[in-house]
């Protein structure tokens, strides 16, 4: 825009003062000019000075209201370059504008999305970039609205980042994902821009290339901050979560890292960016998040924008002059002539000022009217778009109906063809064929109607599209005419000001330069003629503009009718609001009355609540008394068993007694806590009732097991144990009686139960059987020796099974070979599983020793935990012995010298032995140990392999045994009866033998558990079982003393004879 650099003082003295309204008008004018110059259809980058004025305007008015008021009227749908530069300005204003700009953008998100969708459906290079850029802007707006701690410029300190991320790992995880999405949108825009540009570096020096590259400056600024924040958040996530969980995050970060590094490298090589921005360099490789110290090596990338040289500002017009209406044309011509030769009197200056003011007011009026017309036209276009969308939806529905009609028509035609094929069947099908033909004709008629309707909708749609295009063209022509008028006004203003300056100079030198003025008369006359021609052209364009203005005024009248209709609807709505207000006042009166009633009901409820509270206290006390009475009955029953002669046959081990006494002693603490809570709040007795119930059961169990343990103990310890149990029962009954009395309940002392329970615990410890006769310093060596011997026994068993496999292949064939291979393969799998279990148990044992010995040596640790060590030795011996027995039984079965049942029993014994080894290893293992998890998995595998051995043995036994059918031919009734009686006799004999064997098995198990409980030496009848002395070094089976078990009941006779077998548990 042209402006006057040297303004005379007299003109400046006549300028009006800057009121608020004038300042606002000047601000709007400056913003409109900057927006129109920044966002245009020229393929050139946005000038920084125009964008800077728009950004300063947002800070001036603390928002972007003025910007959007002008930007919403831009014809963005007519030019993809215009839309691209519009997105660029949006990005700059969002980054550097006032913070309130973000909320103004939120209201126009739908407009931004519509622009992107519009150009996304068109095959245009800039249109594709506009679609991607709008997605980036929408993502940026959503992110900053959701996280207000991050400004639109993305520049925050590490403290603010830590505060925004918080301490919740879920929030950190989600924030990282959102930043990844943000970075993806930025990188996608940069990749799309580079994809459209030529690879030559010189492209960046062309205006078309610079137009595409200019927005990437903001992308570089955003990406540098996002990269730094994602690195920080990734390190924080790796400090809270395992590495496997974040594998997807690391892969996504590495992909973005390489894309960002490539983007920065390509941008650094372009000359266009070298003078505008200093791009940081990223490291050669991505950070190693698995190493926490790598965070100290991370360097924050910093983008530097060099200070620009101050651009020469385009001066603004100090005096704005518009074209005058047609009636004032002679006045303008006369003014130009008078400015050249001077006015005849001094009053013309005032007339010229008035004329300028009138022209300015008229131009402002026309401008306001034009803005209103443009807004109305935009609204009309929006309505047309809505109608087009509705018609398109209706057209789609008609297409669906047409498709459905075609399908129905095809089905009916198919039915008609079938009916025609069946025409020879008789007159019975004649009616059906006619009905099908009628349906087909009706369907065809409906199809033709739908086709006509479809054609009509297509024509309507095309007509609406033409109208929409005509309206857009009309608006474009109107805007071009307005710009032409503005240019003409600027030319006239410049010429008038130039003439005015020359006239003033002539007036000052008129006395001595009159002749010179006469010579210039002809030149001024020519200029006047040219000005008249320009004025006539302006008049013609003004007449055309006035005709278009009349058309728009007609549309304005129509819209005014719509406004009046809306005002009538508004009045009706206001009357409805008044009615609602009256109803609301009545409702408030009624609610005040109800409020008074509710207050009375509230007082009544409070009194009822007080009664219910007292009832609750009584009920809680009743529950406590009931629980105390039940506990008293349980304890009384336990105390009565101390003198019960029927209880003399019951026995228990000291180890079990110690475990029960310790549990009862631990329950005393819970009882004390529950008693304290009940005294603090009598409304809740649940804790005291639960603790009392647990204590009564555990105390009664301790008393009963103490008496049962005394039956196997020597006389003096047994008497002391019985006396202590009686004392414990008496104190427990006294405590329960105190809890039933409300007056004595606060003075009850549950801690008095600790002394008798500790006495029982100490006596149980004294009654435990002594350890094996092994020096404690030899235990560590014995453990390693026995584990090695077990591994060697298993390896030997595997080799023997392989030898048996090869021997069976040479000596057997057919079904026997198949059975033998199946049994030996299952035994081989079992041996491999046992070997893996022994290796895992050895690893777990070493882990236990290393974690538990502290500063002590390995031998000292084994000596300190001698019983656990003895358990490991016993378990390893059992596993080795079981493997040896399994191989021997399998050898006998293959050679047809043994029984299949021996192999089944050996499989069960191996499963029990491995369970014993697992139990011995789990005693001191950490529950979170990976070796313990693998040991348990190996134990389950051993059980599965043992079950496979049993299954293969049983199936092989059934396959080999002959199952001949009985031949009843030739037998008379007498012979059949005789054989039946003989079979019954045989069954009775076998049942008696089975019963005797079960009794013998029960006796053997009873003796076995007695010997295991006392750690005794096996009898001479079992030469294959070694002495428990560890110096023997034999791999025979040790006594199984680790698993508590009760002998099974065979029949009633066995119950009467032996009673209940005691449970023995050896603690390691």
From Swiss-Prot:
SUPFAM superfamilies: ENTH/VHS domain (SSF48464), I/LWEQ domain (SSF109885). Signal peptide: none annotated. Residues 23-151 form the ENTH domain. GO terms for cellular component: apical plasma membrane; cell cortex; clathrin-coated pit; clathrin-coated vesicle; clathrin-coated vesicle membrane; cytoskeleton; cytosol; dendrite cytoplasm. Residues 592-608 have a biased composition (Basic and acidic residues). Residues 771-1012 form the I/LWEQ domain. Disruption phenotype: Hip1 and Hip1r double knockout mice are dwarfed, afflicted with severe vertebral defects and die in early adulthood. Residues 867-924 are annotated as: Important for actin binding. Keywords: Acetylation, Actin-binding, Coiled coil, Cytoplasm, Cytoplasmic vesicle, Endocytosis, Membrane. GO terms for molecular function: actin binding; actin filament binding; clathrin adaptor activity; clathrin binding; clathrin light chain binding; phosphatidylinositol binding; phosphatidylinositol-3,4,5-trisphosphate binding; phosphatidylinositol-3,4-bisphosphate binding. The modification N-acetylmethionine is found at residue 1. One of its GO terms (biological process) is negative regulation of Arp2/3 complex-mediated actin nucleation. Residues 346-644 form a coiled coil. Disulfide bonds: none annotated. Pfam families: ANTH, HIP1_clath_bdg, I_LWEQ. It is found in: Cytoplasm, Perinuclear region; Endomembrane system; Cytoplasmic vesicle, Clathrin-coated vesicle membrane. Widely expressed. Expressed at lower levels in skeletal muscle and heart. The level of expression does not change appreciably during development. Residues 582-610, 1011-1068 are annotated as: Disordered. Homodimer. Interacts with actin; homodimerization promotes actin binding. Interacts with CLTB. Interacts with HIP1. Interacts (via ENTH and I/LWEQ domains) with BCL2L10. Belongs to the SLA2 family. Component of clathrin-coated pits and vesicles, that may link the endocytic machinery to the actin cytoskeleton. Binds 3-phosphoinositides (via ENTH domain). May act through the ENTH domain to promote cell survival by stabilizing receptor tyrosine kinases following ligand-induced endocytosis. Binds F-actin via the talin-like I/LWEQ domain. PANTHER family: HUNTINGTIN INTERACTING PROTEIN 1, HUNTINGTIN-INTERACTING PROTEIN 1-RELATED PROTEIN. This is Huntingtin-interacting protein 1-related protein. It comes from Mus musculus.
């Amino acid at each position: 825009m042209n402006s006057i650099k040297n303004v005379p003082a007299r003109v400046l003295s006549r300028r009006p003062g800057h009121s608020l309204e004038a300042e606002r008008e000047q601000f709007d004018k400056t913003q409109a000019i900057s927006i129109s110059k920044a966002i245009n259809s020229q393929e050139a980058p946005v000038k920084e000075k125009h964008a800077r004025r728009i950004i300063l305007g947002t800070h001036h008015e603390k928002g972007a209201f003025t910007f959007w008021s002008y930007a919403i009227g831009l014809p963005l749908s007519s030019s993809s370059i215009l839309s691209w530069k519009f997105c660029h300005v949006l990005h700059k204003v969002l980054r550097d504008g006032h913070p309130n700009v973000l909320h103004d953008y939120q209201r126009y998100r739908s407009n931004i999305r519509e622009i992107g969708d519009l150009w996304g459906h068109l095959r245009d290079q800039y249109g594709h970039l506009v679609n991607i850029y709008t997605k980036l802007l929408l993502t940026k707006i959503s992110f900053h609205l959701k996280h207000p701690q991050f400004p639109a410029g993305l520049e925050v300190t590490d403290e603010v980042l830590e505060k925004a991320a918080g301490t919740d790992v879920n929030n950190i995880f989600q924030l990282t994902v959102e930043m990844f999405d943000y970075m993806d949108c930025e990188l996608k825009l940069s990749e799309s821009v580079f994809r459209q540009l030529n690879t030559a570096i010189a492209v960046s020096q062309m205006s078309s290339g610079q137009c595409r590259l200019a927005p990437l400056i903001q992308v570089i600024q955003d990406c540098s901050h996002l990269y730094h924040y994602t690195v920080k958040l990734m390190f924080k996530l790796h400090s809270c979560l395992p590495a496997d969980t974040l594998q997807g995050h690391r892969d996504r970060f590495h992909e973005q890292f390489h894309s960002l590094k490539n983007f920065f490298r390509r941008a650094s090589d372009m000359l266009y960016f070298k003078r505008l921005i200093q791009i940081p360099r990223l490291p050669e490789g991505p950070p190693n998040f698995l190493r926490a110290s790598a965070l100290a090596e991370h360097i924050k990338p910093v983008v530097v924008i060099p200070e620009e040289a101050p651009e020469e500002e385009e001066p603004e017009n100090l005096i704005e002059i518009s074209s005058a209406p047609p009636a004032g044309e002679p006045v303008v011509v006369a003014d130009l002539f008078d400015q050249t030769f001077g006015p005849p009197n001094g009053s013309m200056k005032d007339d010229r000022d008035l004329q300028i003011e009138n022209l300015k007011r008229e131009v402002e009026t026309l401008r306001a009217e034009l803005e209103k017309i443009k807004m109305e036209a935009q609204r009309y276009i929006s309505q047309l778009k809505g109608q087009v969308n509705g018609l398109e939806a209706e057209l789609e529905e008609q297409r669906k109906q047409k498709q459905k009609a075609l399908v129905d028509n095809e089905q009916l035609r198919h039915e008609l063809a079938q009916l025609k094929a069946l025409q020879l069947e008789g007159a019975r099908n004649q009616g059906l064929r006619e009905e099908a033909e009628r349906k087909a004709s009706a369907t065809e008629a409906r199809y033709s109607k739908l086709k006509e309707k479809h054609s009509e909708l297509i024509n309507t749609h095309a007509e609406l599209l033409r109208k929409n295009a005509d309206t857009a063209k009309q608006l474009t022509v109107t805007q071009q005419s307005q710009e032409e008028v503005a240019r003409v006004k600027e030319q006239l203003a410049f010429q008038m000001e130039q003439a005015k300056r020359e006239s003033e100079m002539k007036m000052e030198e008129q006395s001595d330069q009159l002749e010179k003025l006469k010579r210039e008369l002809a030149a001024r006359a020519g200029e006047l003629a040219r000005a008249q021609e320009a004025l006539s052209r302006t008049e013609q364009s003004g007449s055309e503009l006035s005709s278009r203005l009349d058309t728009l005024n007609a549309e304005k009248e129509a819209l005014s009718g719509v406004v009046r209709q809306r005002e009538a609807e508004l009045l009706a709505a206001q009357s409805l609001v008044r009615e609602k207000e009256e109803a609301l006042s009545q409702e408030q009166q009624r609610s005040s009355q109800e409020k008074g009633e509710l207050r009375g009901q509230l007082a009544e409820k409070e009194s009822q609540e007080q009664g219910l509270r007292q009832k609750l206290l009584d009920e809680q006390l009743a529950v406590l008394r009931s629980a105390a009475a039940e506990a008293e009955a349980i304890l009384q029953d336990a105390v009565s068993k101390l003198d019960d002669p029927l209880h003399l046959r019951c026995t228990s081990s000291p180890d079990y007694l110690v475990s029960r006494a310790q549990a009862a002693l631990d329950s005393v603490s819970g009882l004390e806590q529950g008693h304290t809570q009940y005294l603090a709040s009598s409304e809740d007795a649940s804790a005291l009732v639960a603790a009392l119930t647990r204590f009564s059961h555990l105390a009664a169990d301790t008393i009963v097991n103490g008496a049962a343990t005394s039956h196997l103990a020597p006389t003096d310890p047994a008497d002391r144990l019985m006396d202590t149990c009686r004392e414990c029962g008496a104190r427990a009954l006294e405590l329960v009686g105190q809890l039933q009395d409300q007056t004595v309940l606060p003075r009850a002392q549950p801690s008095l139960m600790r002394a008798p329970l500790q006495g029982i615990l100490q006596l149980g410890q004294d009654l435990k059987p002594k350890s094996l006769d092994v020096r404690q310093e030899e235990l560590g060596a014995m453990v390693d020796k026995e584990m090695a011997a077990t591994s060697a026994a298993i390896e030997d068993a595997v080799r023997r099974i392989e030898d048996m496999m090869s021997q069976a292949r040479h000596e057997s064939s057919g079904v026997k070979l198949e059975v033998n291979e199946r049994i030996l393969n299952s035994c081989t799998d079992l041996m491999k599983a046992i070997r893996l279990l022994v290796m895992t148990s050895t690893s777990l044992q070493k882990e236990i020793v290393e974690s538990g010995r502290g500063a002590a040596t390995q031998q000292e640790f084994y000596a300190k935990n001698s019983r656990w060590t003895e358990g490991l030795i016993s378990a390893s011996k059992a596993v080795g012995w079981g493997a040896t027995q399994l191989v021997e039984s399998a050898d006998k079965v293959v050679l047809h010298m043994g029984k299949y049942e021996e192999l089944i029993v050996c499989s069960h014994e191996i499963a029990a032995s491995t369970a014993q080894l697992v139990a011995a290893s789990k005693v001191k293992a950490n529950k979170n140990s990976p070796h313990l998890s693998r040991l348990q998995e190996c134990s389950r595998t051993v059980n599965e392999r043992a079950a496979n051995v049993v299954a293969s043995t049983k199936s092989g036994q059934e396959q080999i045994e002959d199952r001949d059918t009985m031949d009843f031919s030739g037998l008379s009734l007498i012979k059949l009866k005789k054989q039946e009686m003989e079979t019954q006799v045989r069954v009775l004999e076998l049942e008696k033998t089975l019963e005797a064997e079960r009794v013998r098995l029960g006796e053997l198990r009873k003796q076995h558990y007695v010997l295991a409980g006392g750690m005794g030496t096996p009898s001479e009848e079992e030469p294959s079982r070694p002495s428990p002395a560890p110096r023997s070094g034999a791999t025979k089976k040790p006594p199984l003393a680790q698993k508590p078990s009760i002998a099974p009941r065979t029949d009633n006779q066995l119950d009467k004879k032996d009673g209940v077998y005691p449970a023995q548990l050896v603690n390691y």
